Amino acid sequence: MAEPSPAKVYSTGGLYRRWLGAILANDQGLDPEQLTQAALSALSQTSLRRDWPGVSAVLAAIALDLQRHDLRLEQVLFGCRFLNPVGLAAGFDKNGVAASIWDRFGFGFAELGTVTWHGQTGNPRPRLFRLAAEQAALNRMGFNNNGAEVMRRTLEKQALPSPGQRPAVLGLNLGKSRITPLEQAPDDYALSLELLAPLADYAVINVSSPNTPGLRDLQDASQLRRLVERLRRLPGCPPLLVKIAPDLEDDAIDGLARLAYEEGLAGVIAVNTSLDRFGLDGRVLPKTGRTLAEEAGGLSGAPLRQRALEVLRRLRATAGPALPLIGVGGIDSPEAAWERISAGASLVQLYTGWIFKGPDLVPNILDGLIGQLDRHGFRHVSEAVGSGVPWQ
C-alpha cells in the first residue's frame, strides 16, 4: 500500500500549531514583528514562484485543505464578486507581497496595506506586542510600508489577473503619510489611489488608526466629505469604503453612516484597533514592564469583540440594509463570524484571531456558516445578513 502524502498526514493548521503553537502561547516568545516579517518573506517568494511545479503543488495542497466552495456563500457587492465572505484584514500584507496567493488560504478577499504615498518606517520598536492569554495584540506600528510606488511595482511583478478576474478580491487600504500636514491629506491619499487604482478591486479610506498623529480627526464629517470628494474625482476610481474606529461616540457613528449613504460610498468597515483597554489597564507587558494603560497603541483581538459588534449594530440601525458593512475585530471563531453577519455584516475580516488560531480558522468559519445556513433554512448567506438570528 502506498504511503499517504505529507499533505494528508498533516493539515495546514496542524503544521502551523506544531511549529508555532508554543511561540504564540507565550508573550515573550519570538518577537511578533520578526515572526510576521519571516512569514511575509516566505509568502513573497511563494507568490513570485507560484507557477513553479514544486511550489504549485504545495499551494494546491494548501488550497485543497483550506478552501471551501459553496454557491450559497458567493456574493456580488459594490461590483465585486466574492466567492466567500471571509477576508484577510489590512495590516498583515502591508506591501502586497503575497497578493496573488491569498485565495489558496481560503480567503474570499484580502485587503492590502495600509499603504501611504511616502514610504515610511513607522514608529520606533518595539511596537507590536502579543497578549497570549487574552488572544489579543497591542500595536503602534505607525503605517510602516514601502510606499505606493513600490507597492505598484510589487503587484506588477506578481502578474495578477485583472480586477474582476481574480479568485480573491483585492482591496487597497489607504493611509495618510506621516509627513503630510492634515490639511493636505486629500491630495496625499489621492496620489496613492491614482497610482494604484488600476490594480485594486476596491479601496478603503483609513482614517481610524490610532497610531498616526491627527489621523482620527479625518473622521469628522466635514473633513471626511472633503476627502471622499477629492478621491471620487480621480479617473478610474474604484469603489470606496471607509474604515472607522471603535472608540467613536454614537452620534459620530450615526453621522458617518449618514455621510457614507449621502456620498454613495460602497461600504463601511467596522472597526479598527481601539485605544480602550477593555478592563486590561493593569495588564503588564513583559517586554517593557509597563501596563497597557501606560502603553500607546491600538488593541485588537478577542477583547474588542463586543465593542466591534456594538458599532456594527449601530451602523446597521442608522444606515439600513442598503449600505454594505464589513465586520472586523475579535473574530476568532465560526460563532463570532456568524454573530457579525447576523448583526448586519455582509463580509467579515480576520487578522489577530487568524494569527492565534492558525490558517484553518478560515475553513472552520466557512464550514460553520454553511452549517448555520442549513440549520436556519437560509438559501443564501445574504438572507442571514442583518437577520438577528443567533448561532445554534
From Swiss-Prot:
Its cofactor is FMN. GO terms for molecular function: dihydroorotate dehydrogenase (quinone) activity. Its EC number is 1.3.5.2. Keywords: Cell membrane, Flavoprotein, FMN, Membrane, Oxidoreductase, Pyrimidine biosynthesis. It catalyses: (S)-dihydroorotate + a quinone = orotate + a quinol. The active site is at S209. Substrate binds at K94, N139, R140, M141, G142, F143, N206, N211, N272, T273. Binds 1 FMN per subunit. It is an enzyme of class 1 (oxidoreductase). It is found in: Cell membrane. InterPro entries: Aldolase_TIM, DHO_dehydrogenase, Dihydroorotate_DH_2, Dihydroorotate_DH_cat, Dihydroorotate_DH_CS. FMN binds at A90, G91, F92, D93, K94, T114, N173, N206, K243, V271, G301, G330, Y351, T352. Catalyzes the conversion of dihydroorotate to orotate with quinone as electron acceptor. Belongs to the dihydroorotate dehydrogenase family. Type 2 subfamily. This is Dihydroorotate dehydrogenase (quinone). The lineage of its organism: Bacteria, Bacillati, Cyanobacteriota, Cyanophyceae, Synechococcales. The gene is pyrD.
